[in-house]
Amino acid sequence: MAKAPIRARKRVRKTVSDGVAHIHASFNNTIVTITDRQGNALGWATAGGSGFRGSRKSTPFAAQVAAERCAEAVKEYGIKNLEVMVKGPGPGRESTIRALNAAGFRITNITDVTPIPHNGCRPPKKRRV
């Protein structure tokens, strides 16, 4: 019995005017995710996935490259305005925001959402190098 030909469904791209850029800047890496207002991820990039390895992964330049790659990934959605949420103490906080601004997005507001414990868990011991 002959099988019916399988047709690929056309993916309909939705257009989003406003988005939210979530920047997670740790000491080791920087993760940039751009979502719509509801939180559905439209595109993401990391410093490690952008070709940086080891200690170069935790540099402001690596975070800038990750932000540029993430901006390219979401250009097709037609995002014009971005709300930026920054989490973490890493070195890529500021350079990521500058790169998103240079990519042509209008940044409406910047929010720091770094989790701060109200004296919760004990922090790790100090490094002795």
Curated annotation (Swiss-Prot):
S-S pairs: none
Keyword annotations from UniProtKB, A to Z: Ribonucleoprotein, Ribosomal protein, RNA-binding, rRNA-binding
A GO CC term attached to the entry: ribosome
GO molecular function, one term: rRNA binding
Keyword flag Plastid: no
Pfam families recorded: Ribosomal_S11 (PF00411)
Domain of life according to the entry: Bacteria
Gene Ontology BP annotations: translation
InterPro entries: Ribosomal_uS11, Ribosomal_uS11_bac-type, Ribosomal_uS11_CS, Ribosomal_uS11_sf
Gene3D superfamilies attached to this UniProt entry: Ribosomal protein S11
Functional note: Located on the platform of the 30S subunit, it bridges several disparate RNA helices of the 16S rRNA. Forms part of the Shine-Dalgarno cleft in the 70S ribosome.
Subunit structure: Part of the 30S ribosomal subunit. Interacts with proteins S7 and S18. Binds to IF-3.
Family: Belongs to the universal ribosomal protein uS11 family.
Protein known as: Small ribosomal subunit protein uS11
Species of the source: Yersinia pestis (strain Pestoides F)
